[in-house]
């Protein structure tokens, strides 16, 4: 996804592929040795980390059975795509950046641009597929359990590559301008205005809009469920504090005769403290049926309280039980709010990283072909925009896998070579 053709004039690209900036032509003699060394180290480190990170994700899914599900198949396919970007595209892009000119010939240039557009577009569309899968899972959890099959995942993955091919192939079939190959030292994508609109909207702007809509709805659905849980907790707490359940009405009295009088379980501790009752029945001095309950107070003392059977039902809610329920309700409410904050944070990281990496590139890619010679892009800024887009292939495994505890456990096994021993 080279946005800037190093050291060149004002040509452009669309989806992931080189474009050039306006200004004076910079020859290869202007590239210093220190620039080449520093740039090589920086880009080499980025490429190495991208290869290692995505390879670990693929290995974790392949070796750990608990990770082999439909959701992780999409993440694994994303890692394979980003691995292809890191292995097939980034080395040539780094060479182009370090030398400040294209030295591999026109055929290799065409192949480089096609791979660049194909892999980067597919990577972006994989993010859409993951968002779509999550949207279905959270908005239709019952029915989607049966629909969430490997076949559906394969269909989504195939669709991302198909769209990538449809965007990357047209320039090779002639959808370009005569000026695209006029400079042998530059490797640029088609600057045709129609292709620029077609490629930028197909590779980024439409997927961006889709992801914003999907993650917006995911957030609303998640927040609705969380707040519904909070309301249930609050209602349960209120019922515990203020509600009363009537005492049971046995069909027979102690002596076996049918009785219409209610039994009461009302307990008061004269000394105060928390109470816990365990009932038994015996005969009173006047012949009335009495229920004896053993009362355990906080002070470990015991007393027996006779309860006359004539009395009507009287609610009893021990203070310690009420306080415990209040504490539980408050804890659940805090957990629910914490889940909502985590949801906001996760979705913010996903969308924020995607927009930060790709939006600058695609703004420039869409605008520059229409500016002709009136627009000027500083060389350094163009290089930063190019590699900011490429760095998304490094960040994707961090966002979608390394924050996941199941993946973390699999990575630890890989590091400790537990899979090798098995």
Swiss-Prot record:
* Cytoplasmic compartment spans: 60-73, 133-152, 217-346, 404-422
What does the entry give for GO biological process?
A: adenylate cyclase-inhibiting serotonin receptor signaling pathway; behavioral fear response; chemical synaptic transmission; exploration behavior; G protein-coupled receptor signaling pathway, coupled to cyclic nucleotide second messenger; gamma-aminobutyric acid signaling pathway; regulation of behavior; regulation of dopamine metabolic process
Q: Any idea which GO molecular function terms this record carries? A: G protein-coupled serotonin receptor activity; Gi/o-coupled serotonin receptor activity; neurotransmitter receptor activity; receptor-receptor interaction; serotonin binding; serotonin receptor activity
Record SMART domains: 7TM_GPCR_Srsx
Q: Which UniProt keywords apply?
A: Behavior, Cell membrane, Cell projection, Disulfide bond, G-protein coupled receptor, Glycoprotein, Membrane, Receptor, Transducer, Transmembrane, Transmembrane helix
Enumerate the transmembrane spans: 39-59, 74-98, 108-132, 153-174, 194-216, 347-370, 379-403
Report the membrane topology from the UniProt record: Multi-pass membrane protein
Q: Which GO terms describe its cellular component?
A: dendrite; plasma membrane; synapse
Query: Which pairs of positions does the record mark as disulfide bonds?
Result: 109-187
Query: Per UniProt, where does 1D-myo-inositol 4-phosphate bind?
Result: 314, 345-346, 352, 403-405
Renumbered to this chain, motif DRY motif spans 133-135
Pfam families found in the cross-reference section: 7tm_1 (PF00001)
Annotated region described as Disordered, given as residue ranges = 1-23, 235-262
Q: Does the keyword Membrane apply?
A: yes
Activity regulation annotation text: G-protein coupled receptor activity is regulated by lipids: phosphatidylinositol 4-phosphate increases HTR1A-mediated activity.
Q: Where does serotonin bind?
A: 116, 120
Glycosylated sites: 10-11, 24
Positions in the Extracellular compartment: 1-38, 99-107, 175-193, 371-378
**Localization, UniProt:** Cell membrane; Cell projection, Dendrite
Q: Which PANTHER family match?
A: 5-HYDROXYTRYPTAMINE RECEPTOR 1A (PTHR24248:SF191), ADRENERGIC RECEPTOR-RELATED G-PROTEIN COUPLED RECEPTOR (PTHR24248)
Quaternary state and interactors:
Heterodimer; heterodimerizes with GPER1. Interacts with YIF1B. Interacts with GPR39 and GALR1.
- Chain's role: G-protein coupled receptor for 5-hydroxytryptamine (serotonin). Also functions as a receptor for various drugs and psychoactive substances. Ligand binding causes a conformation change that triggers signaling via guanine nucleotide-binding proteins (G proteins) and modulates the activity of downstream effectors, such as adenylate cyclase.
Q: Which family does it belong to?
A: Belongs to the G-protein coupled receptor 1 family. 5-hydroxytryptamine receptor subfamily. HTR1A sub-subfamily.
- UniProt-recorded name of the protein: 5-hydroxytryptamine receptor 1A
From which source organism is this entry? Gorilla gorilla gorilla
Per the UniProt record, the lineage of the source organism begins with:
Eukaryota, Metazoa, Chordata, Craniata, Vertebrata
Q: Which gene encodes it?
A: HTR1A
């Amino acid at each position: 996804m080279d946005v800037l053709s190093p050291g060149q004039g004002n040509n452009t690209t669309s989806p992931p592929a080189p474009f050039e900036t306006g200004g004076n032509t910079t020859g290869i003699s202007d590239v210093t040795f220190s620039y080449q060394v520093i740039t090589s180290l920086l880009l080499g480190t980025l490429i190495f980390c991208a290869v290692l990170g995505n390879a670990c994700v693929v290995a974790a899914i392949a070796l750990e059975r608990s990770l082999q599900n439909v959701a992780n198949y999409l993440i694994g396919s994303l890692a394979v795509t980003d691995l292809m970007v890191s292995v097939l595209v980034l080395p040539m892009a780094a060479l182009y950046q370090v030398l400040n000119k294209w030295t591999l010939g026109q055929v290799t240039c065409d192949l480089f641009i096609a791979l660049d557009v194909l892999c980067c577009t597919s990577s972006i569309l994989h993010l859409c597929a993951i968002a779509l899968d999550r949207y279905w899972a959270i908005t239709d959890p019952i029915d989607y359990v049966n629909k969430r099959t490997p076949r559906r995942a394969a269909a989504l993955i195939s669709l991302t590559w198909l769209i990538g091919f449809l965007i990357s192939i047209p320039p090779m079939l002639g959808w370009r301008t005569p000026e695209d190959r006029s400079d042998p030292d530059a490797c640029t994508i088609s600057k045709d205005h129609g292709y620029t609109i077609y490629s930028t909207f197909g590779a980024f702007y439409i997927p961006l809009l889709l992801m914003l809509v999907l993650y917006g709805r995911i957030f609303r659905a998640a927040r609705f469920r969380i707040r519904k849980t909070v309301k249930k907790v609050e209602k349960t707490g209120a019922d515990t504090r203020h509600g009363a359940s009537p005492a049971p009405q046995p069909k027979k009295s102690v002596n076996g005769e049918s009785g219409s009088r209610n039994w009461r379980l009302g307990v008061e501790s004269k000394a105060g403290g928390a109470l816990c009752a365990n009932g038994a029945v015996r005969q009173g001095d006047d012949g009335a049926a009495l229920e004896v309950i053993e009362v355990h107070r906080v002070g470990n003392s015991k007393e027996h309280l006779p309860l006359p059977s004539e009395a009507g039902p009287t609610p009893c809610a021990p203070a310690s039980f009420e306080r415990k329920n209040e504490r539980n309700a408050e804890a659940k409410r805090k957990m629910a709010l914490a889940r909502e904050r985590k949801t906001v944070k996760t979705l913010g990281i996903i969308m924020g990283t995607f927009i930060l990496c790709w939006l600058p590139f695609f703004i420039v890619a869409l605008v520059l072909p229409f500016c002709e010679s009136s627009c000027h892009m500083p060389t350094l800024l163009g290089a930063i925009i190019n590699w900011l887009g490429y760095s998304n292939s490094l960040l994707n495994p961090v966002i979608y896998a390394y924050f996941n505890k199941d993946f973390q456990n699999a990575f630890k096994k890989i590091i400790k070579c537990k899979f090798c021993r098995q």
